[in-house]
Amino acid sequence: MTLSGTSILIVGSTGGLGREFAQQLSARGAKLTLASTSAPKLGSLGIAGASAIGDVTKPGIPEHYVQTALDTFGRLDGVIYAAGAVAFGPIGDYTDEVLDALWQVNTRGWMSTLRAATPSLAASAAEGGSPFALSLSGVVAEAPTAGMAPYSAVKSALHSFGVAAGRELRRQGIRLVDARPGHTETELSLHPLAGSAPAFPAGLSPQKVVERIIHGLEAGEKDLPSSSFAGLS
């Protein structure tokens, strides 16, 4: 499939990977709806497209994102969920507030967004499109990591949700894709909800990770495990 001319919603578009998706998809000619909690950060992207401001964990905001795409472009052909939050430390150090936030941002937000987007994605398929919905569970969904147990858990749940929901939604012509790259050099680990990041080895390039994912979307791939990113730097 070609992504040129397709209407794509990017949730978390001002984060490390979200920003890279916005830049690369804009260069490919996609029609973007850029969703973020921060209007100033969204404005600083300098990327053409519709803007949707709001916290994805709040009621009605995922629907607002989708409606913005429909109002601007008349259709929705793809959704990328790049929102995320991380925390570090032994399980005994986590507060309920941090545990709840990890679930809300990483997992529940995607569930709500996909629910809101499904009718529009199904309409795209009915009109001959090849709609997709992309999540980014990361390598911790394959290899849960000590010191990141709650984060590993919510990302594993994100992956499992995608597998099951993908079996449902393929009947409507919607392709769900989950990407599980290894540690990537974004700023996510510099701003944890709790704890401090360990000394990770050098991570993958966000540019190359996103290039690989976009290639997979264009090629019709349905799953991008960590092995898909082997050899990237």
Identify what each model region corresponds to.
Residues 14-15:
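Conserved glycine-rich cofactor-binding loop
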